[in-house]
């Protein structure tokens, strides 16, 4: 099948990303003061400390599960410091206008294939496709967010997610960019070889 190479490259990029990023996982528990300061466009000192660590280790800031105004405050400062960033789970709670603003800062926008396994999967997948098109394929990263016992294994799930993207009209080249090239660029990897047959 013509998209088999896309699945192969996607799996490779995902595994490379996991190996490189797991070394620098830092979890921060948000509190009310942090939320208030972010609403005013400020960050608590701990955020600056974490951004310093990320910069020192050439690591990636993966931010999600916080309010859009907090996201903007954090990622503006990350951009100012030269920290590569991705906003996770953008399809859930980050308005398209905010995604566009983040993309303009050089932030990658992650969209999770977990939506393909929800009860309302058709509508969720269509909504994600619309968001990707509104912001631009060049800013999108498509991952799975899988790993739960009731869902498929991540490599299988990524193949299903790729099929969903193709059904939404994305080309093989666009899918490859979202599942391989953009993740590779995020983690600072070298450009990949072209797919077999130059597609």
Predicted regions and their residues:
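Active-site beta-loop-alpha junctions enriched in small/polar residues
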Residues: 1-4, 66, 90-93, 112-116, ...
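Acidic (Asp/Glu)-rich catalytic clusters
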Residues: 52-55, 75, 79-80, 99-106, ...
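Divalent metal-coordination and catalytic microenvironments
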Residues: 1, 61, 109, 145, ...
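Divalent metal-binding pocket/active-site signature
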Residues: 1-95
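Short acidic/histidine-rich active-site segments
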Residues: 137-154
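Structural preference for beta-strand elements that scaffold enzyme active sites
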Residues: 60-62, 84-86, 106-110, 139-141
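Charged helix-capping and loop-helix junction motifs
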Residues: 44, 121-130, 156-161
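Mid-to-C-terminal alpha-helical segments outside catalytic/metal-binding sites
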Residues: 158-199
């Amino acid at each position: 099948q013509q998209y088999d190479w896309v699945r192969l490259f996607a799996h490779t990029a995902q595994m490379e990303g996991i190996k490189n990023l797991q070394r620098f996982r830092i979890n921060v528990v948000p509190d009310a003061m942090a939320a208030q300061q972010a609403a005013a466009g400020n960050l608590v000192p701990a955020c600056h400390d974490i951004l310093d660590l990320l910069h020192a280790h050439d690591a990636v800031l993966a931010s999600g599960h916080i309010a859009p105004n907090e996201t903007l405050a954090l990622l503006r400062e990350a951009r100012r410091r030269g920290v590569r960033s991705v906003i996770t789970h953008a399809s859930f709670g980050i308005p398209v206008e905010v995604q566009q603003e983040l993309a303009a800062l050089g932030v990658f926008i992650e969209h999770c294939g977990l939506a393909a396994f929800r009860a309302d999967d058709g509508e969720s997948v269509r909504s994600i496709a619309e968001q990707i098109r509104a912001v631009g394929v060049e800013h999108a990263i498509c991952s799975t967010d899988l790993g739960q016992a009731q869902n498929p294994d991540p490599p299988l799930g990524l193949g299903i997610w790729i099929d969903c993207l193709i059904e939404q009209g994305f080309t093989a080249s666009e899918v490859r960019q979202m599942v391989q090239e953009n993740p590779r660029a995020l983690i600072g990897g070298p450009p990949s070889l072209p797919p077999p047959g130059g597609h």
